[in-house]
């Protein structure tokens, strides 16, 4: 598989002392103290770096959800040995209990201080700031442009509760045409126990890395010859994807949706009308000329659904119209941000668009929330974090429509009984939205589902319907994606299960292990029975000893291993070993078939055998 390999799992998880009771790790965004600790740690690190490397120029150093980082412009690359020296320098600064003090200065004063320190990046940052300019001093000699907040002094930082974790490359302002910088990542917590728990979770995250699992289980690859960010689904991964798609289609049909299939390319004029060329061109692949017309790969499915709506006259009696598509889109992603299945250049979105009347908004949003819960819970995601983003200062659309749409979203969430936070002014310029994050098995939150109202595309494409009074009116358009993209969801799901997929979703559900050549015909006969019953089964024909057959099956995370010896063949039975339930003993073939079919129909995690 091309691209960077996941980090090796170290022995740190085993050597880090585990806390005696479960440690709840606070989130930076929800803990003022943790935010101050991490923000202050980034300053302490920058000070230590400049003490050790006087030629290093500082840029920015924010807090993150698990720690902090700082970007430096240094003539020589930092090394792992440098990180150790920097950490020692940080501990010295912490032990000195140096004060962190907020100072307001004029633009001219700030400019003079920056020039005196020869900090060109800070000078550029200053140009974008409004007076009064704030900076924070650390001790008497070191300072940084910053709005805060910070701890009162470095003695409030725990020298045993932080770590410098890694080095990475970065570009100034995230622009590949600008200076390449060196980023140092760190983590900081309130206590050593929290740090130990963070390390444990990090090791667990490495064990669950979907790139490693994808390679070990032969699920997918990304091939250099084809290009970066383009996914090759191998048979086992394709089987899982097919199961996801089949469930998704069934749920949508039952939810009152119809399916669409739309082209992968369109005339460039479509992207002009939709506004993508004005606002999204940097994320689109370049045009191609065919028969003297310019075409571009689609970055989104929305304009195609809009054209389908506009293909005939619509009546209010038809609304709501619900259309869904598993549509593959193509977006340019910079080389440095692509990551396994999580960030790719070609991916399949589970897009749906609802065209409805204004008074139908609340009911339609509630139906979408119900469908979202049904689909996500089938993959064992049941804890959600929900944000409702409202009208920004710059927006399009009438006040009454915005108010009605926002009220409809709130009403639907209230009717659903889901807790949510309001992000005032955080909506898109063309409509309010709901964002839903899912929590995985190790407590990480992943952005997943989006429900977005759109007042822009109906206006740009002049969509309408004939109202009850015979007038033409604009429909309300709701964008909606539950998975976000199949590729990204597949990666999240794989890490959530650590590759141990539930029985109904496993690419290979049962592996038959014939102990001798004499029982091989019986194994082949049983394979035929299982396959015809809709069970995904194989026979291990390697001829290896039983111990190795079992180890190989366990390494491939097969849910059920069926050992076949002479006794089992005589009894028309198998000896079952389950990853979930252990040794299940000798089981009649008829019972295995019934249990497997039941597990598939109920989308169950394992077999329920009648004993």
Curated annotation (Swiss-Prot):
Taxonomically, the superkingdom here is Bacteria
Q: Where is this region: Disordered?
A: 1-27
Classification via Pfam families: HGTP_anticodon, tRNA-synt_2b, tRNA_SAD
Q: What class of enzyme is it?
A: ligase
Lipoprotein listed as a keyword: no
Query: Where does it reside?
Result: Cytoplasm
Query: What quaternary structure, including any partners, is listed in this protein's UniProt entry?
Result: Homodimer.
Q: What does this protein do?
A: Catalyzes the attachment of threonine to tRNA(Thr) in a two-step reaction: L-threonine is first activated by ATP to form Thr-AMP and then transferred to the acceptor end of tRNA(Thr). Also edits incorrectly charged L-seryl-tRNA(Thr).
Give the protein's recorded name. Threonine--tRNA ligase
Per the UniProt record, the source organism is Synechococcus sp. (strain CC9605)
């Amino acid at each position: 598989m091309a691209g960077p390999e996941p980090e090796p799992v170290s022995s740190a998880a085993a050597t880090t002392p585990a806390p005696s009771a479960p440690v709840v790790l606070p989130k930076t965004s929800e803990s003022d103290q943790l935010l101050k600790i991490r923000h202050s740690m980034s300053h302490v690190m920058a000070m230590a770096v400049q003490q050790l490397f006087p030629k290093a120029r500082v840029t920015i150093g924010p807090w993150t959800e698990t720690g902090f980082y700082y970007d430096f412009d240094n003539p020589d690359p930092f090394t792992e040995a440098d990180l150790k020296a920097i950490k020692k320098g940080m501990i010295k600064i912490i032990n000195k209990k140096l004060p962190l003090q907020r100072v307001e200065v004029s633009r001219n004063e700030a400019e003079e201080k920056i020039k005196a320190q020869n900090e060109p990046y800070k000078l550029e940052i200053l140009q974008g700031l409004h007076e009064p300019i704030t900076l924070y001093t650390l001790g008497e000699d070191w300072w940084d442009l910053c709005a805060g907040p910070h701890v009162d002094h470095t003695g409030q930082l725990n020298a045993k509760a932080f770590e410098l974790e890694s080095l990475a490359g970065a570009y100034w302002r995230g622009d590949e045409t600008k200076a390449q910088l060196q980023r140092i990542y760190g983590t900081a917590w309130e206590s050593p126990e929290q740090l130990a728990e963070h390390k444990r979770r990090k090791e667990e995250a490495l064990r669950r890395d979907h790139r490693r699992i994808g390679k070990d289980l032969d699920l997918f690859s990304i091939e250099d010859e084809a290009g970066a960010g383009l996914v090759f689904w191998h048979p086992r991964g394709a089987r899982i994807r097919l199961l996801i798609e089949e469930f998704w289609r069934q749920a949508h049909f039952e939810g009152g949706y119809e399916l669409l299939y739309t082209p992968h390319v369109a005339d460039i004029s479509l992207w002009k009308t939709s506004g993508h060329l004005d606002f999204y061109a940097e994320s689109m692949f370049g045009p191609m000329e065919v028969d003297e017309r310019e075409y571009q790969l689609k970055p989104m499915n929305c304009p195609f659904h809009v054209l389908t709506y506009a293909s005939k006259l619509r009546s209010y009696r038809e609304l709501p119209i619900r259309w869904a598509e598993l549509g593959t889109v193509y977006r340019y992603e910079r080389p440095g941000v692509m990551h396994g299945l999580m960030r790719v250049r070609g991916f399949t979105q589970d897009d749906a668009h609802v065209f409805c009347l204004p008074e139908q908004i609340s009911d339609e949003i509630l139906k979408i929330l119900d469908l979202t819960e049904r689909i996500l819970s089938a993959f064992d995601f049941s804890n959600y974090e929900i944000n409702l983003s409202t009208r920004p200062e710059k927006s399009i659309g009438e006040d009454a429509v915005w108010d009605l749409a926002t009220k409809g979203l709130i009403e639907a969430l209230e009717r659903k009984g889901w807790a949510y936070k309001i992000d005032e002014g955080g909506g898109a310029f063309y409509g309010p939205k709901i964002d839903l994050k899912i929590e995985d098995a190790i407590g990480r939150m992943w952005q997943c589902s989006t429900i977005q109202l759109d007042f822009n595309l109906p206006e740009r494409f002049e969509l309408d319907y004939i109202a009850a009074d015979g007038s033409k009116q604009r429909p309300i358009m709701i964008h909606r994606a539950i998975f976000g993209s199949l590729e990204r969801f597949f990666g999240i799901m794989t890490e959530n299960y650590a590759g141990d997929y539930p029985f109904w979703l496993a690419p290979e559900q049962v592996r038959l292990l014939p102990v001798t050549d004499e029982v091989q015909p019986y194994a082949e006969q049983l394979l035929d029975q299982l396959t015809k019953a809709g069970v995904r089964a194989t026979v291990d024909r390697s001829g290896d000893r039983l111990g190795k057959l079992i180890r190989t099956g366990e390494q491939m995370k097969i849910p059920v291993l069926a050992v076949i010896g002479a006794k089992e063949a005589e009894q028309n039975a198998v000896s079952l070993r389950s990853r979930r339930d252990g040794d299940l003993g000798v089981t009649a073939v008829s019972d295995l078939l019934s249990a497997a079919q039941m597990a598939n129909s109920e989308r169950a995690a394992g077999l329920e055998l009648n004993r």
